[in-house]
Each structure stands twice: as structure tokens, then as C-alpha cells.
């Protein structure tokens, strides 16, 4: 497997490049418009063909690079079915794997940060990796106070879906504001200050209710654009 973790500094967002060594097909999870050219350069340098861009959810802090990458490569935009995004080529559903060459990416419906959120599990010879988007971060999680988010729902999603994976499954988050790169399911289950360490759903709901976070600066632009797979920004 070919794997790259790519960072976008303005929104502290991670994009993940996954490639099949045998077929040379590739996918990008959560590409960002401002770094789409960088991602495309990496794909070309590695001799890969971009088959899919894959969203974890409709983002509020950046615009997806899906449309721009599709225009340049013919890739397909895979978006969670509950997003109801215009111009999507593939509706992501739990139980329907996304094949990237010989690699099998398993979608997990993990609402709570937003009501359309998905995580993705990739099983390989070296174990499992889970791309958690904003559902689970390193020592944290995404907010639950917009886009039909719900703290109790997020708690159940993480505990029932992500924490059900093996302890040694690697956790690759959608963001990290300290540029930490990777954790594990066992580590987050044991010590995540919001969701781990045996915290109850009521404790988690209280933690999230007390955050009082500011509105994302790009939300009014990003959400409408992402509901069109970035087409508005790509035109």
C-alpha cells in the first residue's frame, strides 16, 4: 500500500492519500481546495491515477478540492449519502466498501459531529487504520453544536463503531491543531479526555455543552460550496 498524510495549515486539516501498489489506483480522503495542486503533484510523482476523492462529511472550515481534482483527473467524488450533495458521483453507505484497486475501504456511519459523518477503515497486512474525520481526534473530538450535531449521538458513534476496533488500529484524525499525526484506538479509548477513560455519555454531553466555541470563519462559504462538491469554488 502507498500512504501519505498531508497537512493543510490554515484549517489544520489532514488529507490522506491511499494508493494500491498493484493497480496504481489512488484515493484522497478529505482533500482541501487550497492544497489540491500539491496533492495532484504527489499523485503524479508516485505514478498513480486518482480514482476517488472521499469526504468524511460536509466541512465547515474549508472547501473541498474534489471538484478541482475531478476536473483535472476524471476522479469520482464520493460523499456520504446523508449529505445530499449535488454533483457527487458516489453516495457513501455503510456496508458498501469502496475499492481502490485491491484495497478495501470500509465506511462506518459515525454521526454526531455532523449528521452525515462517516469514518473509514482500511485493513492491511500491517493491521487496521481508521480515518476518523472529526468524529474522533487525538485527545479530543469535533464539536457538536452545528450542522445537526448531537453530543450523545457522537458518543454512541465513537464507542459503538470506532472503539469497537482492535486496540492497535491506528487512528488518523481529520485535524490536529498541534500537528500530531497518529494515535491508536486503545490509546484514545483509554485516555481521550472527552470520550475515553470510562466517561459516561452524560459526562461527555456536559463537556461538549460547556465548550462555547466560536463560529468557524469560513462556514458561510464552505458549507454551501461543499454541498456542491466544491463546484462553486472550482468555477
Predicted regions and their residues:
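Short, polar loop motifs at secondary-structure junctions
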Residues: 78-85
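Active-site metal-binding motif and surrounding structural segment of the metallo-beta-lactamase
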Residues: 35-78
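Generic structural signal for helix capping and beta-alpha/helix-loop junctions
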Residues: 60, 85-87, 179
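Short, hinge-like loop/turn segments at secondary-structure boundaries
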Residues: 45, 70-74, 94-98, 188-190
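Residue-level signal for the nucleotide or nucleotide-sugar donor/cofactor binding architecture
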Residues: 64, 148-149, 199
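Accessory terminal helices/loops
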Residues: 156-170, 174-235
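Catalytic core of the metallo-beta-lactamase
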Residues: 1-50, 86-176
Amino acid at each position: 500500500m502507498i500512504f501519505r498524510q498531508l497537512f493543510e495549515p490554515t484549517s489544520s486539516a489532514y488529507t490522506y492519500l491511499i494508493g494500491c501498489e498493484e493497480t496504481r489506483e489512488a484515493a484522497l480522503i478529505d482533500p482541501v481546495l487550497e492544497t489540491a495542486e500539491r496533492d495532484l503533484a504527489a499523485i503524479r510523482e508516485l505514478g498513480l491515477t486518482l480514482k476517488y476523492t472521499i469526504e468524511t462529511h460536509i466541512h465547515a472550515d474549508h472547501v473541498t478540492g474534489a471538484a478541482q481534482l475531478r476536473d483535472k483527473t476524471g476522479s469520482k467524488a464520493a460523499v456520504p449519502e446523508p449529505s445530499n450533495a449535488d454533483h457527487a458521483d458516489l453516495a457513501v453507505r455503510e456496508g458498501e466498501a469502496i475499492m481502490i484497486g485491491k484495497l478495501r475501504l470500509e465506511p462506518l456511519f459515525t454521526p454526531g459531529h455532523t449528521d452525515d459523518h462517516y469514518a473509514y477503515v482500511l485493513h492491511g497486512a500491517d493491521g487496521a487504520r481508521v480515518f476518523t474525520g472529526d468524529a474522533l481526534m487525538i485527545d479530543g473530538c469535533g464539536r457538536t453544536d452545528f450542522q445537526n450535531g448531537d453530543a450523545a449521538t457522537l458518543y454512541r458513534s465513537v464507542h459503538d463503531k470506532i472503539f469497537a476496533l482492535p486496540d492497535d488500529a491506528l487512528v488518523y484524525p481529520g485535524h490536529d491543531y498541534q500537528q500530531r499525526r497518529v494515535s491508536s484506538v486503545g490509546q484514545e479509548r483509554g485516555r481521550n479526555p472527552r470520550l475515553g477513560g470510562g466517561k459516561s455519555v452524560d459526562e461527555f454531553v456536559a463537556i461538549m455543552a460547556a465548550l462555547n466555541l466560536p463560529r468557524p470563519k469560513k462556514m458561510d462559504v464552505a458549507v454551501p460550496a461543499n454541498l456542491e462538491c466544491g463546484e462553486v469554488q472550482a468555477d
